[in-house]
Amino acid sequence: MEAFVRETGRAVVIPNDNINTDIILPKQFLKNILKTGFGKDLFFDWRYNADGSLNEAFELNKPAHQGASILITGNDFGSGSSREHAVWALTDYGFRAVIGGGFSDIFYMNSTKNGLLPIVLPEENRKILRGIQADENIQIDLPEQTVTYKNYTFHFDINSQWKEKFINGEDDIDNTMKYEKLIAAFEKQRPNFG
């Protein structure tokens, strides 16, 4: 997992509430178990017209938003089925963080396990962030747990263990491997029933 300490980047605002995993990445794209190649299908039904052409009115398709690394959204983002692929689509597109009013528990956990930082901010903070222009940046400082835009700085909460994993760029396997010697010693003490 790529370390996340600070991110300064442009943001895309999709302020809708209740964006579920089927909207983020429709079911027809779940046939692959690789974590790459999903970015082009992110928000597929919103990004493309019925004839397959780009919906130029959709925020992700606007040239000014290309390369954005932060998504600002509404409440209850990522609800619906447990679809790790939805997180993969967001990260493959280039998003490093999603700022919302809340996330489904499963989506939140899938995000933390796959290097997408989910940040919960109240409506009054997100209302200010929704005013961001395409050429402006937001800075996320994970050690300080802050989001800064212009002269505004907002604090967010995150579990200390997840924070450490993000800062160190460690996934669950990396975390387990820290205990490799202890695990090996324990296994040597156990009888072999093989």
Swiss-Prot record:
GO molecular function: 3-isopropylmalate dehydratase activity
Top-level EC class: lyase
Reaction(s) catalysed (UniProt annotation): (2R,3S)-3-isopropylmalate = (2S)-2-isopropylmalate
Pathway(s) the chain acts in: Amino-acid biosynthesis; L-leucine biosynthesis; L-leucine from 3-methyl-2-oxobutanoate: step 2/4
Presence of keyword Amino-acid biosynthesis: yes
Enzyme Commission numbers on file: 4.2.1.33
Matching Gene3D superfamilies: Aconitase, domain 4
Annotated keywords: Amino-acid biosynthesis, Branched-chain amino acid biosynthesis, Leucine biosynthesis, Lyase
Database matches in CDD domains: IPMI_Swivel (cd01577)
Biological process terms in GO annotation: L-leucine biosynthetic process
Keyword Amino-acid biosynthesis assigned: yes
GO CC, any one term: 3-isopropylmalate dehydratase complex
InterPro entries the UniProt entry points to: 3-IsopropMal_deHydase_ssu (IPR004431), Aconitase/3IPM_dehydase_swvl (IPR015928), AconitaseA/IPMdHydase_ssu_swvl (IPR000573), IPMI_Swivel (IPR033940), LeuD (IPR050075)
Subunit field text: Heterodimer of LeuC and LeuD.
Family statement drawn from the similarity comment of this UniProt entry: Belongs to the LeuD family. LeuD type 1 subfamily.
Function: Catalyzes the isomerization between 2-isopropylmalate and 3-isopropylmalate, via the formation of 2-isopropylmaleate.
Name under which the protein is recorded: 3-isopropylmalate dehydratase small subunit
Source organism (scientific name): Leuconostoc mesenteroides subsp. mesenteroides (strain ATCC 8293 / DSM 20343 / BCRC 11652 / CCM 1803 / JCM 6124 / NCDO 523 / NBRC 100496 / NCIMB 8023 / NCTC 12954 / NRRL B-1118 / 37Y)
Gene that encodes it: leuD
